[in-house]
């Protein structure tokens, strides 16, 4: 009888260790990074404006800045300006930008969570980026001003529904 109790205890002990080990493995899979940028400068306030010459320079600068970051997936909304912002880096990396809906930030966040072990770039808009970052679990970031195009958010997954974000500036374009 004591042997059975010892055996059960031993099995429970082993099961506990395996469960703890799987938890550590699951947690360590959340090692991905998401770079998030607003589209570059545009020519006008029209709904689907194209990039200005300065915006095209910034898009090239983005490709140079993140070209060696190990990006595996690129998301951009369907607007011309976001696609144009993503184009130089997609070309440099040999990737295609996956088009996402402008306002459906929840769907994008769901996709990003399934890629929590990857390095991803998101090209979006001033009014959606803060919401995406908050929904990813990094808290709030300052609103993006209408004339602000140089913010580069670097989000790092720390768990399935959490992460940390650092805000950088890139490309001091004239």
Which residues does each predicted region cover?
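N-terminal pre-catalytic segment of deacetylase/amide-hydrolase enzymes
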Residues: 2, 26-27
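Short beta-strand segments
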Residues: 123-125
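Bacterial N-terminal signal peptides that target proteins for export
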Residues: 2-14
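Compact alpha-helical subdomains of small soluble proteins
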Residues: 119-120
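Active-site-proximal alpha-helix that buttresses catalytic centers in soluble enzyme cores
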Residues: 29-116, 128-174
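Cleavable N-terminal signal peptides
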Residues: 15-16, 26
């Amino acid at each position: 009888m004591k042997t059975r109790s010892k055996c059960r205890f031993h099995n429970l002990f082993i099961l506990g260790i395996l469960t703890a080990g799987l938890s550590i493995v699951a947690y360590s899979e959340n090692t991905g990074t998401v770079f998030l940028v607003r589209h570059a400068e545009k020519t006008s306030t029209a709904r689907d404006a194209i990039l200005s010459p300065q915006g095209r320079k910034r898009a090239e600068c983005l490709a140079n800045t993140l070209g060696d970051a190990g990006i595996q997936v690129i998301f951009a909304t369907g607007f011309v300006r976001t696609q144009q912002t993503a184009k130089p880096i997609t070309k440099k990396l040999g990737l295609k930008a996956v088009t996402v809906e402008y306002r459906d930030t929840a769907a994008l966040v769901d996709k990003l969570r399934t890629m929590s072990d990857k390095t991803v770039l998101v090209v979006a808009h001033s009014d959606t980026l803060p919401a995406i970052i908050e929904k990813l679990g990094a808290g709030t970031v300052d609103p993006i001003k209408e004339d602000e195009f140089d913010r580069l958010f670097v989000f790092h997954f720390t768990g399935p529904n959490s992460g940390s974000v650092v805000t950088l500036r890139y490309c001091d374009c004239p």
